[in-house]
Structures are given as structure tokens and as C-alpha cells.
Amino acid sequence: MQWLRVRESPGEATGHRVTMGTAALGPVWAALLLFLLMCEIPMVELTFDRAVASGCQRCCDSEDPLDPAHVSSASSSGRPHALPEIRPYINITILKGDKGDPGPMGLPGYMGREGPQGEPGPQGSKGDKGEMGSPGAPCQKRFFAFSVGRKTALHSGEDFQTLLFERVFVNLDGCFDMATGQFAAPLRGIYFFSLNVHSWNYKETYVHIMHNQKEAVILYAQPSERSIMQSQSVMLDLAYGDRVWVRLFKRQRENAIYSNDFDTYITFSGHLIKAEDD
């Protein structure tokens, strides 16, 4: 509570100033004034026996005396004595309450933009061994192979000649026809073929491996005073039913292949490498 200013009655211009505070009013007055202020009751005007030349003045106001002329004019006006007006001044800071409880949490904000990709982390430890998978479908094992030999020598004639073979080394599923001297592809795929012959002294060796009616590769040796072994091999992409066989060239070029009844000098072999649907 700050000091109060008391104003003199107009009838008495004594030139004196009266100041009073909560210490003069006492604790009871201070509590009463505080109660009246909080209840918004109009201010009370008090009357003193003598008038005070100035109005209510706080202790912190200027200490200069009032103008005597102003005091004299106030006393000669003939107005009745007025009660001094007391206006309490309360420092609001002393009425500050306790700190309130925190309010409820607000709604989550919007998701921010995606940040840049971080650097790769260290390699993790090896995981546990996985369970064994379910068994797969059984493979369809398909093997086709043949190997045949000839012990009879052959000379060129008026026309092309197909080499026939008398001896069978391998003929799986009968894929090589001994009567015609031809291999018939049982399914589409890649096949490998090889041919070995013995040349004849002073004669050419002129033989073709045929794919159907087309010459695939040639086995050739020039005339020589010595006879030697010659070989040729090839891989062919065959469709189902394609035929592969060996053909000797005709007489317009004198040629022959050598063999005898004791040894097998001429052989023709082939087998499936990979079926198309594998």
C-alpha cells in the first residue's frame, strides 16, 4: 500500500499539509480499504476538523508548499467544509496468483520434408541359416546319343553315295537308323556330331556331313602317297525330325575312303547337348 493524499477543506486554509499512510490507519483500515476495492464499492470521503490547503498527495509528490494566493481564494469562497477524499492506491503486483497448470498438448504439426540420404551403415552380422525349401519338380532326363562304325572301304561312283555303317557302339533309343545311315532328331535342340575317316593313297578324300539335304561341313584331304586319318566335327541346331547323315562325293572327282575287315577306320557319332525346352 502506497501513501495517501488528504485534501483540505475550503474553509480552512492553514497552509499545512497532512499525509497519512497505512501505518496511520492501522492494519484494520488497510484490510477494509483492500476489501472495498476488491468489492468495487465507491470510495469513501472522510472529514477532518481542519481543512488542508492541498488535495490528497502521495509521499513521493513534490514537497513545494502550495501557493498562498490559491489558499486564500479557496478560504474566501464561502463554500462549506468538505470531507477529505481518500483514494487508496494498490500495487497490483502483490495480487499475483500462483503459477497455473500446464495446458493440454497441441495437435501434431505437419510432416517435414524428407532429409538427404544418410551414409551406409556398417555391415551387419551374418544371419541365421534359412530353412530348407520345398523339393522341386523332378528333372526330365533326356539323353540321345549314337556312335557307329564302318569296316568297308568306299570309292566314288556316278552319283553321291550315303555312308552306311555295320557296327554299333552306342544307339540310345534307336535314334540312328542303321538301314538308311541317318540320325533323326527326336526333339528340337543343340546336337554335336563328329566324323573320322582314313584317306586312300593318291586319291582325294571328299566327304560331307549333311543336314537334311544341305551340306553342313566338309571333310577333305588332298591326294598323297601316304594315307592318314582325317576328322571333322560340328554342332547343329536341329528341329524335331531333322536328319543328319554322311555323303561321299561323286566320281567327277576321283575320291575314296579306306578301311578293311580287321579294323574300324570310319566312325560317325552324335549326341544331344541341350534340348530347347530345358
Curated annotation (Swiss-Prot):
Domain C1q: 139-259
GO CC terms in record: collagen trimer; extracellular space
Gene3D superfamilies registered for this protein in UniProt: 2.60.120.40
A Pfam family per the record: C1q
Signal sequence coordinates: 1-46
GO MF annotation: an example: identical protein binding
Compartments it resides in: Secreted
Glycosylation sites: N91
Residue span(s) of domain Collagen-like: 97-138
InterPro entries per UniProt: C1q_dom, Cerebellin_Synaptic_Org, Collagen, Tumour_necrosis_fac-like_dom
Keyword Endoplasmic reticulum among record annotations: no
Major location category of this protein: secreted
Taxonomic superkingdom: Eukaryota
Keyword annotations: Collagen, Glycoprotein, Secreted, Signal
Region described as Disordered: 99-135
Protein name: Complement C1q tumor necrosis factor-related protein 6
Species name: Homo sapiens
Lineage: Eukaryota, Metazoa, Chordata, Craniata, Vertebrata
Gene: C1QTNF6
